[in-house]
Structures are given as structure tokens and as C-alpha cells.
């Protein structure tokens, strides 16, 4: 047998941990008890219930009462009286800007609502750390959403029934066709629903007996399932941190 070496074995260099992908799902005006995992006996939300069961479920929150302040707080980690809510200045640093500095590619799909609902270029998503943006800069109070792709106005839609699916399709398209597979990603998907004026597809209205709010909640759950299935199909599920929350509860 060979003699044991008098020298200690070389220390293996530790591999750098793989950076996780990050998916943030953010709904609008959704109530605490709207999901099965938070007590709803009426709304069927199997996808989000499974997410809660497999992950960490938080049950006590402090939230802002309205959209803009909640969103600026989420984006910056700062109290709304500092980050200014709907009037969030270009000088605020978002989590997207921080993540870009450490190699992330960044995308925002859906409702922005921190640029006073106006196309102010230096306060829109592309200027606040997001490489890609598709969505509405404000709310759908009038039953319409004005849509931008990056900084470009692409049109106005009054199809509130199709908005959740549209945003999900854009998020899926980003994952499948646009992201760089060699980099970790941040995808911030901020749905307009369940903010009034609400609507859902004919399929979910029929499924819920024309209970419109239930239809909106259940369609969101279904569309979330499509998105999570896409992560799994692409082999990304095990290395993606999924965070789901709502902005402020029912309005």
C-alpha cells in the first residue's frame, strides 16, 4: 500500500452557488380570504393552494391601502412616504436595478402605476431597471387599459376579460423566446385583476355560474398554473423563487 501523504489534502474550491431565478406574482385589490389556502370555501384555487402548501405561507401583514404606495414600497423596499407612491421619482432605486448589477436579466409585465399613470420616460420600467416591459402604466377604472411595449404605446384595450390571459401569455413568451438562458432572470408580473372594472372569460363565467368575482379569482389561479407549468417544462422550476402577494386587499 502507498504511504499516506504527510501533506494535507488540497482544499477543493467551492463552486459558486447558482443564482436563483425570481418570479413575483402581484395581484390588485385581491382580498386575504379569496384563496382556498386562506380560508375561502367558495373560490377554487388549487394552484395557489399547492404553492402555499409547498412553500412558506405568511398570515400577518401590514399593507398600504391603495395601489401606488404599495407598489413603490415593493419596488424600492422603502416606506411610501419616502418612495412617493404614484409619484415615485426616477431617483428611487428598484430591486430590478440592484439585481441587474449582479447579472440578472429583468422583465416587468402588467400594471406599473408609479409614474402618475403617464408615459414619463425616466419613470417608466425601462428606466427603472427592467430590460423588458409590457403592460399598462395605470389602472383600468374606465374599463380600458392603455398598453405599452417597453416605451412604445401599442394600443388601448377594453377587453378586461382577456387581460389576465394576455399578461400571462406575455410572461410565458418572455420565458420561452426572449430571455437569455445563460443568465438568471427576474420576472415581475403585476396583474390588473381583481381591480374593478373586473371581467373574466366566458369559460370561467360558465364554470362559476356567472359569479363574476369568483370567475376572476379562479381564472387568475388557472393562468398562474400555466405560467408555473412553463417554468417546469423549461427545467427552471427547481431554481426559481416564486413570490405571490397582493397590493392592498379589496377596494
Where are the regions that the model predicts?
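Formylglycine-dependent sulfatase
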Residues: 1-251
Amino acid at each position: 500500500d502507498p504511504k499516506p501523504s504527510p501533506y494535507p489534502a488540497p482544499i477543493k474550491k467551492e463552486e459558486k452557488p447558482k443564482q436563483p431565478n425570481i418570479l413575483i406574482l402581484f395581484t390588485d385589490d385581491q382580498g386575504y380570504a379569496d384563496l382556498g389556502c386562506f380560508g375561502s370555501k367558495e373560490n377554487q384555487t388549487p394552484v395557489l393552494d399547492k404553492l402555499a402548501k409547498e412553500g412558506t405561507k405568511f398570515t400577518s401583514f401590514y399593507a398600504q391601502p391603495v395601489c401606488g404606495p404599495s407598489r413603490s414600497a415593493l419596488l424600492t423596499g422603502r416606506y411610501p412616504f419616502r418612495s412617493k407612491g404614484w409619484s415615485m421619482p426616477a431617483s428611487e432605486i428598484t430591486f430590478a436595478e440592484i439585481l441587474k448589477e449582479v447579472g440578472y436579466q429583468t422583465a416587468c409585465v402588467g400594471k406599473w402605476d408609479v409614474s402618475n399613470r403617464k408615459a414619463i420616460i425616466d419613470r417608466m420600467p425601462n428606466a427603472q431597471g427592467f430590460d423588458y416591459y409590457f403592460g399598462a402604466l395605470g389602472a383600468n377604472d374606465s374599463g380600458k387599459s392603455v398598453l405599452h411595449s417597453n416605451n412604445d404605446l401599442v394600443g388601448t384595450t377594453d377587453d378586461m376579460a382577456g387581460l389576465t390571459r394576455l399578461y400571462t401569455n406575455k410572461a410565458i413568451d418572455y420565458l420561452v423566446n426572449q430571455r437569455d438562458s445563460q443568465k438568471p432572470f427576474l420576472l415581475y408580473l403585476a396583474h390588473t385583476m381583481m381591480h374593478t372594472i373586473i371581467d373574466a372569460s366566458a369559460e370561467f363565467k360558465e364554470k362559476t355560474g356567472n359569479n363574476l368575482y369568483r370567475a376572476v379569482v379562479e381564472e387568475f389561479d388557472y393562468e398562474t398554473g400555466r405560467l408555473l407549468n412553463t417554468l417546469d417544462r423549461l427545467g427552471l422550476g427547481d431554481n426559481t423563487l416564486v413570490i405571490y402577494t397582493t397590493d392592498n386587499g379589496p377596494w
